């Protein structure tokens, strides 16, 4: 049997009512989520501005132009005052403040924010300079996507290329870009890639070129300080030419740093560097360094002292605060471990390994008295190719003198030295080192 027609109509009507109710709930929920997203955006922006001003000394103000459930548009004004400029270079103490304005546009969806930031080249104190240089189309900007659901952020930033010519002098800046993946507080992974730059100075007859610099770093806030537990960088090539046939070329530079906690009170840092080739030439000399390697660790650093030093350095406070932080670190002592310092100089191998220990002391004692030197102890081993003097003639007189004094010993086709530091006394191959 078929249901009565009026029952069918009531069923369809009920479905429509349910659909309308569900739709209304979704719309209201979406609008509520957008309202919440907008309020959260306002709070996060205010917190980030306050943090930027506190940590950098740069003044940042936000002037909203359009505010509704789905939009936050306005202008970010950034001012670098003379006192902040002077902290980087004392000669800038009396200069005028640098003012920049950025167009800041954000689109709000439920629990999702997409933002775009770009320098307005027609505003601020840089505008006349950029106009004179023909850089009205130059871009300095960033865009980001933030999720309040996962409390995550994905951003990218860029600086476009430009060229400045003045007479026969020329400066070329190639594009730079990077990205960030992490949380809304700034804990995450940052990468950057700069294609490089070239400089030609006709007056000094100097040419400089830097090509393909890449870097990445893990960022983390630890006890209120921004630290990088791990970072790395690579530089493909660098060259510098100056009058007198002076030329320096570098290829294949890589670096890596690591910061780890030993326990609740101490930490260790490790720095590694590799150089494929470094050539230095002049009219008189030529030195080729290949297979360069450095592996250096500092262990047992006082955690509280290290954090205080980082905070003092980042805020560019007076020297007394920095010295106080150094004293805090020195009171615990530390160990320097040189796992490897090696290279080939014009084909001949040279290397240095060992470790040095610093007993608890103070900065004043370490720098200004024999008592501070007594806090140092360690043992280093040097190995030099026996033909180093032939390969690098400018080193030959020194090598001959050290060999005659017993500071270098010929052994197993090498020149070897053992440098021992014991409570301030230095010996080389068991012989006291004379100043």
Spans of features found by a protein language model:
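Gram-negative bacterial Sec-dependent N-terminal signal peptides
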Residues: 5-33
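Glycine-rich, small/hydroxylated-residue low-complexity segments
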Residues: 20-21, 29, 34-435
């Amino acid at each position: 049997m078929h249901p009565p027609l009026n029952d069918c109509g009531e069923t369809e009507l009920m479905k429509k009512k349910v659909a309308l109710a569900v739709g209304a709930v979704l719309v209201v929920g979406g609008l509520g989520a957008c309202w919440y997203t907008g309020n959260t955006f306002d709070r996060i922006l205010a917190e980030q501005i306050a943090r930027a001003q506190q940590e950098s000394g740069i003044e940042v103000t936000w002037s909203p132009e359009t505010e509704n459930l789905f939009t936050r548009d306005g202008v970010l004004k950034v001012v670098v005052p003379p006192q902040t400029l002077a902290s980087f270079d004392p000669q800038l103490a009396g200069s005028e403040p640098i003012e920049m304005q950025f167009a800041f546009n954000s689109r709000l969806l439920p629990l999702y924010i997409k933002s775009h930031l770009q320098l307005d080249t027609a505003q601020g104190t840089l505008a006349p300079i950029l106009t004179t240089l023909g850089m009205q189309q130059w871009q300095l900007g960033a865009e980001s996507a933030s999720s309040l659901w996962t409390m995550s952020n994905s951003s990218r930033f860029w600086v476009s290329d430009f060229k400045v010519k003045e007479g026969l002098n020329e400066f070329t800046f190639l594009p730079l870009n990077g990205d960030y993946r992490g949380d809304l507080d700034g804990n995450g992974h940052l990468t950057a890639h700069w294609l490089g730059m070239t400089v030609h100075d006709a007056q000094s007859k100097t040419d400089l070129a830097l090509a393909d610099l890449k870097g990445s770093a893990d960022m983390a806030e630890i006890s209120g300080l921004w630290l990088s537990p791990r970072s790395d960088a690579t530089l493909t090539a660098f060259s510098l030419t100056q009058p007198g046939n002076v030329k320096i070329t570098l290829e294949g530079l890589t670096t890596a740093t690591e910061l780890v906690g030993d326990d609740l009170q101490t930490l260790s840092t490790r720095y590694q560097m590799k150089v494929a080739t470094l050539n230095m030439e002049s009219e008189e000399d030529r030195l080729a360094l290949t297979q360069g390697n450095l592996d250096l660790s500092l262990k047992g650093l006082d955690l509280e002292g290290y954090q205080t030093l980082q905070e003092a350095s980042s805020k560019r406070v007076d020297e007394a605060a920095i010295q106080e932080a150094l004293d805090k670190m020195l009171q615990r002592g530390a160990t320097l471990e040189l796992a490897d310092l090696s290279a080939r100089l014009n084909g001949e191998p040279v290397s240095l390994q060992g470790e040095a220990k610093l007993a608890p002391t103070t900065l004043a004692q370490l720098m200004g008295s024999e008592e501070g030197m007594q806090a140092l102890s360690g043992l280093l081993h040097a190995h030099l190719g026996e033909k180093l003097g032939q390969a690098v003639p400018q080193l030959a007189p020194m090598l001959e003198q050290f060999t005659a004094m017993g500071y270098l010993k010929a052994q197993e086709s090498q020149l070897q030295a053992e440098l021992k530091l014991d409570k301030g006394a230095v010996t080389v191959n068991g012989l006291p080192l004379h100043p």
